[in-house]
């Protein structure tokens, strides 16, 4: 699929592999991390080998998160692939997820363009908060959505997919 539609960087949050590692195929490099004992909650980056020369990795010690750094012009780009628990998860698990993300944000140079990739299981609603969320958020804001919005405000982040209208699913 990455060849047919020319994807240079693909961040995947639904990986069912165990452990951490790297794989090489003909045209792509794969950097992955997953739990040691369960085949769930893993993530990976699939990178076209043409841009691999522009890639540096910071491999955090947590199994569910990865950070990829890419040299670019006029700015470098940092992509964080993060695991966030579902809305049914215990609060301690959600707290740990956000703490782990805070740790990754500290590793990110302030001059980099930052992209955080994940399904947040959050409904942020359509109220829109200037500089944080747009008016095209999903549904009515839930507790997880409020937590994400608060996190974005504290860290000066924007939930980009709420800034434009999505197709109905």
Regions flagged by a language model, labelled:
Residues 1-169:
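A shared catalytic/ligand-binding motif for oxyanion handling
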């Amino acid at each position: 699929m990455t060849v047919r539609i020319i994807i240079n960087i693909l961040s995947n949050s639904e990986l069912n592999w165990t452990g951490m590692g790297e794989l090489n195929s003909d045209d792509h490099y794969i950097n992955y991390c997953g739990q040691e004992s369960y085949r769930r909650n893993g993530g990976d980056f699939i990178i076209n080998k043409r841009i691999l020369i522009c890639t540096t990795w910071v491999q955090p010690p947590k199994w569910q998160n990865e950070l990829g750094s890419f040299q670019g012009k006029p700015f470098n780009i940092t992509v964080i692939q993060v695991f966030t628990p579902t809305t049914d998860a215990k609060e301690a698990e959600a707290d740990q997820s956000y703490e782990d993300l805070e740790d990754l944000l500290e590793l990110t140079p302030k001059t980099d363009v930052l992209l955080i990739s994940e399904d947040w299981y959050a409904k942020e609603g359509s109220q829109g908060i200037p500089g944080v969320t747009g008016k095209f958020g999903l549904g009515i804001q839930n507790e997880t959505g409020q937590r994400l919005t608060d996190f974005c405000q504290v860290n000066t982040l924007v939930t980009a997919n709420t800034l434009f209208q999505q197709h109905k699913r």
